[in-house]
Curated annotation (Swiss-Prot):
Its main location: membrane. The gene is ZP3. Component of the zona pellucida, an extracellular matrix surrounding oocytes which mediates sperm binding, induction of the acrosome reaction and prevents post-fertilization polyspermy. The zona pellucida is composed of 3 to 4 glycoproteins, ZP1, ZP2, ZP3, and ZP4. ZP3 is essential for sperm binding and zona matrix formation. It comes from Canis lupus familiaris. This is Zona pellucida sperm-binding protein 3. Belongs to the ZP domain family. ZPC subfamily.
């Protein structure tokens, strides 16, 4: 009553509540301005990918730990950050951390993903945040300069050289079984066949013929990894077909600038991972040039135990058995068209870029149902153990019942009187 009366008198004398009540009487909530900044920001640079992640990833006020964040299939770790920083940063090359590259009609697309996989802190067994996966893509136009800087007169970016000077764009893609479209899922079952299509987009360039010089399968995008398997070797010999597989080049070609081949999928027995990468070295020659030992596409046919080329004389494949293919002392005359092409290539080499060849990686190819998939094993092993236990118990019960019946019959035969089963057990 006294407080209300005092406020009423103050209002009459001073004419305002704000002069009478400098302190807020009723409790109020504090409102913070909403921010438009996304929790994950991506900068697609010329040769680098920069990912910036807010520690308040879920917008709940609970900060995540940088150690719970990784990038890509190879689980790349973020840069070291201070505890006072409110963001976590990744800076990686476009081809690092297992990123995947795809060639579309209008762009090169590099794709990867950000993983938040929380772990309990200290000795706790609880989590306060969820696992999250954020897909990331960088699109680079194929018909423009992707450099973020101005082009210097003394330096031509690789993409500019490839698209505007030589007009060559190489690609290696996984295809569906009918070769009609690109395979949407990279998953396989062991025993499946992978359909791969190598191609060069020539633009306004002279007609060219594409070859797969060599291919190698590895567990990571690094083609020089210690654990590897050669698929194509010796300048175009599909050596994987020598083993227990049907791997082969497809003949005839759909076009000179396209080469298709199949590979029986496999996994490395000495490693538990269920993914592989295939890296192929592609090259081109003028379309009118006759294939030779250095430029060929040869498959091994088991029914005849011989090598056969997609085009050209069968003699060019004989070196595949020797494991050494080359043309020592080659001195044949070049055609006028080839001399002009070589001159253009020489000019490109002087600018530090050789665009008649390229090394392309496709992957990862993921194998489902592999024996090392512990999640599958964990779900089936208990069931199998229970079934075995029940089966064993059944066998033991039947055996005991048989023994009891035999003993009862012998006892009846010896004593003649009819004895009820209850007396037998006594």
């Amino acid at each position: 009553m006294g407080l209300s009366y005092g406020i009423f008198i103050c209002f009459l004398l001073l004419g305002g509540m704000e002069l009478c009540c400098p302190q807020t009487i009723w409790p109020t909530e504090t409102y913070y301005p909403l921010t438009s900044r996304p929790p994950v920001m991506v900068d697609c640079l010329e040769s680098q990918l920069v990912v910036t992640v807010s520690k308040d990833l879920f917008g709940t006020g609970k900060l995540i730990r940088p150690a719970d964040l990784t990038l890509g299939p190879e689980n790349c770790e973020p840069l070291v950050s201070m505890d006072t920083d409110d963001v976590v940063r990744f800076e990686v090359g476009l081809h690092e951390c297992g990123s995947r590259v795809q060639v579309t009609d209008n762009a090169l697309v590099y794709s990867t993903f950000l993983i938040h996989s929380p772990r309990p802190a200290g000795n706790l067994s609880i989590l306060r945040t969820n696992r999250a996966e954020v897909p990331i893509e960088c699109h680079y136009p194929r018909h423009s300069n992707v450099s973020s800087q101005a082009i210097l007169p003394t330096w031509v970016p690789f993409r500019t050289t490839m698209l505007f000077e030589e007009k060559l764009v190489f690609s290696l893609r996984l295809m569906e079984e009918d070769w009609g479209s690109e395979k949407q899922s990279p998953t396989f079952q062991l025993g499946d066949i992978a359909h791969l299509q190598a191609e060069v987009h020539t633009g306004s360039h002279m007609p060219l013929r594409l070859f797969v010089d060599h291919c190698v399968a590895t567990l990571t995008p690094d083609r020089n990894a210690f654990l590897h398997h050669k698929i194509v070797d010796f300048h175009g010999c599909l050596v994987d077909g020598l083993y227990n597989s049907s791997s082969a080049f497809k003949a005839p070609r759909p076009r000179p600038e396209t080469l298709q081949f199949t590979v029986d999928v496999f996994h490395f027995a000495k490693d538990s991972r269920n993914t592989i990468y295939i890296t192929c070295h592609l090259k081109v020659t003028p379309a009118d040039r006759v294939p030779d030992q250095l430029n060929k596409a040869c498959s091994f046919i088991k029914s005849t135990k011989r090598w056969y080329p997609v085009e050209g004389s069968a003699d060019i494949c004989r070196c595949c058995n020797k494991g050494s293919c080359g043309l020592p002392g080659r001195s044949r005359r070049l055609s006028h068209l080839e001399r002009g092409w070589r001159k253009s290539v020489s000019h490109t080499r002087n600018r530090r870029h050789v665009t008649e060849e390229a090394e392309i990686t496709v992957g990862p190819l993921i194998f489902l149902g592999k024996a090392s998939d512990h999640g599958i094993e964990g779900s089936t092993s208990p069931h199998t153990s229970v079934m075995l236990g029940l089966g064993l118990a059944t066998v033991v019960s039947l055996t005991l019942a048989t023994i009891v019946l035999v003993l009862a019959k012998r006892h009846r035969t010896a004593s003649h009187p009819v004895i009820c089963p209850a007396s037998v057990s006594q």
